[in-house]
Structures are given as C-alpha cells and as structure tokens.
UniProtKB/Swiss-Prot annotation:
Residues 4-45 form the UBA domain. The gene is PUX5. GO terms for cellular component: cytosol. Residues 343-420 form the UBX domain. Gene3D superfamilies: DNA helicase RuvA subunit, C-terminal domain, Phosphatidylinositol 3-kinase Catalytic Subunit, Chain A, domain 1, SEP domain. The lineage of its organism: Eukaryota, Viridiplantae, Streptophyta, Embryophyta, Tracheophyta. This is Plant UBX domain-containing protein 5. It comes from Arabidopsis thaliana (Mouse-ear cress).
Length: 421
C-alpha cells in the first residue's frame, strides 16, 4: 500500500513540475514524501538557479519550459550546457489531480537567456526562431538592418496581432511605401530651387525699337547672345489615389502607361514627356505630397465674352473686326490692279489705320497719288463702304481731300494715315 501511495506522489510531482522521475523521487524522499514541501523546495531551487549570473559566456539560444536536467547531468561537475542540443521541453495535459491546481508552470532558463513561452494550447515561440519562416514579431521593427539580415524590399510588411483563438494580419499598402522611397531618393539627390534673377532697380526704359511704319527692328547680335534660355518648371503632386503633373488630370500609380514615368522620377531623372525640344533648356521638377484624395478643381468661369467694336465704325466694318485684327500688322494684302510699285523709283512706306482697328503697312512710290492709296484700301476691303475720309496723323489732323495730289506733295511719305467714316 505504501508503494502505491509513493508511486502516486511521484506521478503528481512529475505532473506539477514536469521533472524527471529521478528528481521527483529525490525531492520526495528528502521531505519524507511530503508533496507540498518537495514541490516548494524544487521551485525555490529553480528560482535560485535562475538568479545566478552566467560568467562564462552568453546563454544558450533556447530554453525549455519547466524542464529539468537529469540528476546525472545537473549534479555532475563535468556537465556544461550545450547550445546545439537543448533539452527537450515537455508539454502535458491538465492534471487530473486537485492538488496540482495551486501550482503553475515556470521557466527553467536563466535571467539572460532567450526564453520560450508556452501558451495553454501548447504553441511555443522563441526569439531565436523569430526569423524562421515568415513569422515576424513587433521586436523585428526595432531591429536595424545592420544585423546582416537581408529584407525583401519588394514585399510589404506584415504585422500580426491577436490572442490564442483569434488573430489579425495588417499589411501596409505597397504604393505608400513606394511613394516614401521615391521621396527619400529625391531628397538624397535633390537640388536647390533655382533663384529667379533679380530685376534691376533702374527705372531707365528698355525695349525693342520700332519704326514709325510699324516694322519691328531685329535685336542686335550682342543682345541675342546675352539672352539665356528660360528655365522650365514642372510640379508633380502625389495624392492618395494617384498623381498629377502640373494642372493635368489624375493619373494612377498602377497604370502601366505611367510605369516609365515613375521609374524616371525614382531615378531622379526628368521624364521623357517633360523634356523640351531644345535639350539646352534646363528643366526643374518639384515633387509635392498631399495627404488627401484628388478632387477635380472647378473650371474657371469667363463671364465676359463678346466682340469688340470701335466707336464711330459702321456695322459692316465692325462685324469684320475680329477677323481682320487677327492678321499681322506688317502684312499687307495684294495691291490693286492699277497699283504698280517701281523699285527703281523712290519708294516710301505708309501705315494705314483702318476704322475697324486693322493696321496695314504698304509700300508706294512717291509719284503715287492719294487716289492710289484709297484704291489700295478699297482692294483690301472689297465689301466695305467707300464713304470714308483719310486723315493724317498729327494735331490737328489734316484731311486728304485732293485725290490727285501725290504722296510727296501731300506730305504723307513714311507717315500714318487714318481712315474715318
């Protein structure tokens, strides 16, 4: 009967402490088969062993859960822990004995060891195995890349949270990661924004010269050499749902047509679609990030629309003003059939300001008459009214009433003549 009772006590001790049979027999015999005292002494020795520092070197990478060495190993003076062969841990089911309830499981590892934990379902995890497989913990977030462990930059980070019976995986969006990397690369190779050249504070007049006839004078070669190409500015705005170029439409990150564009931006290169025809013109690209979705801007309203009309102009003349004003000022229509300019004879230029706002510049000989000038105007406006007057530019204006008077006699050589109805 005593043997059966001792056997039950040994089994209960093993179920509570997960120790070996030899250890259970040793502690029970030391306490005259008092189970409570034997378990208390066993756990106290376990806590004392855990509090002792390890002066010889780093602890083994993994430890067992409530495990114990055999007496032949733990009490032998030649025994040293092995890093390559950790003692196996024992998982057990709930003890049927009611006396096992007050006791819990404790780790046998040292204070500095990488400890394994065991949840009630028997699933174990270890820091030494945190990189095994695809399982990662929150401790990996604080680990720097200098540990020599490569990370796949093409895969999004996955975070796990939850308990024993439920869990959740959170994966960050890859496009946000790509935008972050793009901005990081842009910061590394960024250049200062070009400073606009300060304008001179001088109030002296500068500009291009023009003749009284209206013809523009080409600038001098020195001025042309001093002119530098103007810098082209582009702004690329990154939104949560895409990106825009300047004031263009929204473009998606995953669109295959935008792959080449995004690759050029990530390499800090100007995209081909933004390059000017003249390669000498510098291009500056600004990257702007907005933490919101793109919304279509309202279209600008143009409440004032219509056709300009000149005061004192007839209906037929004013109606053709928009069409006539689009013609260049220094381009004259074909001369009338009776007007022939002799290049060998003295010539002059006359600027004609018509009533509809059109400016015509034509060349005449000095022997041409005022009638020839009117014929030139009538030829340029076949459907226009011929009831008009010609006035010279000046104060007071002089009316040209003598049609047979030559240009030289009328004093309108290289002058401006105004048409008035």
């Amino acid at each position: 009967m005593a043997t059966e009772t001792n056997e039950n006590l040994i089994n209960s001790f093993i179920e509570i402490t997960s120790s070996s049979r030899e250890e259970a027999n040793f502690f029970l015999e030391s306490h005259t088969w008092n189970l409570d005292a034997a378990v208390s002494t066993f756990l106290d020795n376990d806590a004392a062993a855990a509090a002792e520092p390890n002066p010889t070197g780093p602890p083994p990478p993994s430890s067992t859960i409530a495990g114990a060495q055999s007496p032949s190993q733990s009490h032998s003076p030649d025994y040293t822990p092995s890093e390559t062969s950790p003692s196996p841990s024992r998982s057990r089911s709930a003890s049927p004995s009611s006396r096992a309830a007050p006791y819990g499981l404790r780790s046998r590892g040292g204070a500095g060891e990488n400890k394994e934990t065991e949840n009630p379902s028997g699933i174990r995890s270890s820091r030494s195995r945190q990189h095994a497989g695809n399982i990662r913990t929150f401790a990996d977030l604080n680990r720097s890349p200098a540990d020599g462990e490569g990370s796949d930059s093409d895969e999004a980070n996955e975070y796990y949270t939850g308990g024993q019976k439920s869990g959740m995986m959170v994966q960050d969006p890859k496009k946000v990661k790509d935008v972050d990397e793009l901005f990081d690369q842009a910061r590394q190779s960024a250049v200062d924004r070009p400073v606009e050249p300060s304008r001179s504070a001088s109030t002296s007049f500068t500009g291009a010269a023009r003749l009284l006839s209206g013809e523009a004078v080409s600038s001098s070669p020195q001025q042309q050499q001093q002119e530098q190409p103007q810098r082209i500015m582009h702004t690329i705005t990154f939104w949560l749902n895409g990106f825009t170029v300047n004031d263009g439409p929204l473009r998606g990150f995953s669109d295959p047509e935008n792959a080449a564009f995004m690759n050029s931006i990530s390499r800090s290169e100007c995209p081909s679609e933004l390059e000017p025809a003249d390669k000498k013109i510098p291009v500056h690209v600004d990257l702007v990030r907005r933490g919101e979705n793109f919304t279509e801007p309202p279209k600008p309203k143009n409440p004032f629309q219509g056709v300009g009309r000149t005061l004192g102009a007839s209906g037929s003349g004013s109606s053709s003003a928009p069409q006539a004003s689009s013609a260049p000022m220094n381009v004259a229509p074909a001369p009338s059939r009776g007007l022939v300019v002799d290049p060998a004879a003295p010539t002059t230029s006359i600027q004609l300001r018509l009533a509809d706002g059109t400016r015509l510049v034509s060349r005449f000989n000095n022997h041409h008459t005022v009638r020839d000038v009117r014929g030139f105007i009538d030829a340029s406006r076949p459907g226009g009214s011929k009831e008009y007057q010609l006035l010279t530019m000046g104060f007071p204006p002089k009316q040209l009433t003598e049609l047979d008077q030559t240009i030289e006699q009328a004093g309108i050589a290289n002058a401006v003549v105004i048409q008035k109805f």
